């Protein structure tokens, strides 16, 4: 199994966790499921996902709290929000707070898989870009007294 296809699912609804876990595993993803945001945060000390799919409204630490944690500490990990509360204000709030995408419940499993796949592809491209930028910067030498740069 590719380590770059690690998806974490956080939802307080057991049936949603079951459907997503089964569907995503069948689609070739490595999946971990969590009942709430506290479980996700506790697991971050041990491992990290390549993408987080989280319910917006959960008891305890909810999806917006997780989004804030990921935005501040793991900004390279895409967060996809899920909710049955698909009003425009909620959607705008999620995007303004750094959500990569948004899935309204009830959802189509193929749509969820497509959004996760796109998030993983974009993450991979951003990582490649960052590596190339670092490589280019390592080739540049800046002379401190003159501030001239050479390659």
Would you name each region that the model predicts?
Residues 39-42, 64-75:
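Short amphipathic alpha-helix used as the core "switch/output" element in two-component signaling
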Residues 28-35, 43:
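Short hydrophobic/Thr-rich beta-strand motif most characteristic of the beta2 strand and flanking loop
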Residues 11, 55, 83:
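Active-site residues of response regulator receiver
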